[in-house]
Amino acid sequence: MIMPQTRLDVADNSGARELMCIRVLNSGIGGKGLTKGGGGNKRYAHVGDIIVASVKDAAPRGAVKAGDVVKAVVVRTSHAIKRADGSTIRFDKNAAVIINNQGEPRGTRVFGPVARELRDRRFMKIVSLAPEVL
């Protein structure tokens, strides 16, 4: 579960290394880019949810700089995800992929496994870039 002030690793090559969640937004992609409706009153973000985050640590000469405010989709959480078949999956660390306003990743690679729930939320580009989908 990700809430404001939570720090996340970045799972892409956009140049950022660490993010801090500022706000939990909607969940998923609509017909034309991100769904409208603002943030609502969600307290926690789970896998596949979109957050607004601040870049806390960045690599030099990257696409994003430290201090930038970006949108990101959560791809891994250390809190267990319960699935419809009764199984659960959890990851070692929280991680996110930085996206643009159309919901496409800003980086060209995704590092580490991602959860299968991203496919249900229509983040197909992230799923196709990931080396493993669990």
Swiss-Prot record:
CDD domains: Ribosomal_uL14 (cd00337). GO terms for cellular component: cytosolic large ribosomal subunit. It comes from the Bacteria. InterPro entries: Ribosomal_uL14, Ribosomal_uL14_bac-type, Ribosomal_uL14_CS, Ribosomal_uL14_sf. One of its GO terms (molecular function) is large ribosomal subunit rRNA binding. Pfam families: Ribosomal_L14. PANTHER family: 50S/60S RIBOSOMAL PROTEIN L14/L23 (PTHR11761), LARGE RIBOSOMAL SUBUNIT PROTEIN UL14M (PTHR11761:SF3). Part of the 50S ribosomal subunit. Forms a cluster with proteins L3 and L19. In the 70S ribosome, L14 and L19 interact and together make contacts with the 16S rRNA in bridges B5 and B8. HAMAP family: Ribosomal_uL14. This is Large ribosomal subunit protein uL14. It comes from Deinococcus geothermalis (strain DSM 11300 / CIP 105573 / AG-3a).
